[in-house]
Amino acid sequence: MQYICKKNKMTNLIVGTVAFDAIETPYGKTDKIVGGAATYISLAASFFTEKLNLVSVVGGDFPKSAIKMLHDHNVDTAGLQIKESEKTFFWSGRYHNNMNSRDTLETQLNVLETFDPIVPKQFSDSDFLMLGNLVPSVQQKVLDQMTKKPKLIVLDTMNFWMDHFLD
């Protein structure tokens, strides 16, 4: 595939959910599919950036083929923790007609409930940091591990964290 723009060489650290999703829209419905903010941030960014670093956690039920897909997009998964005896985070939601609003139908935290992000040393000086949809205390732990202030920090959140972990 030929790119319209040249990929930048800056490093990007992406921390967030690598998960399973089940999604309903007015146009269709999926069962359990590979999802998660960090998954899709990584895949989208891979078209514009050469160096992508991922920190997340999955259970032993997460498909190796999905991890290979990340590798195929030059995503370094040295920071991906795999907890073999546990289940991967799962989210289910229904999107409304305008596709801007949605209702959460189910959230199973699973491995995310005890996720302690460990930023590998080689990731700690990344130029950009994308903190995906995670509990704010986990996002703060990532910030505390950065050895160099990123040029840009992007933060995502969701009503679940605000409703349950506002402290």
Predicted regions and their residues:
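Extreme N-terminal starter segment of soluble prokaryotic enzymes
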Residues: 8-13
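Active-site metal-binding loops of divalent metal-dependent hydrolases
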Residues: 17-18
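Conserved N-terminal subdomain of the carbohydrate kinase-like
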Residues: 21-32, 49-130, 144-150
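Short catalytic helix/loop segments, enriched in acidic residues and glycine
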Residues: 28-43
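A short, N-terminal amphipathic alpha-helix
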Residues: 39-53
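Conserved beta-alpha-beta core of the PfkB/ribokinase-like small-molecule kinase fold
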Residues: 128-167
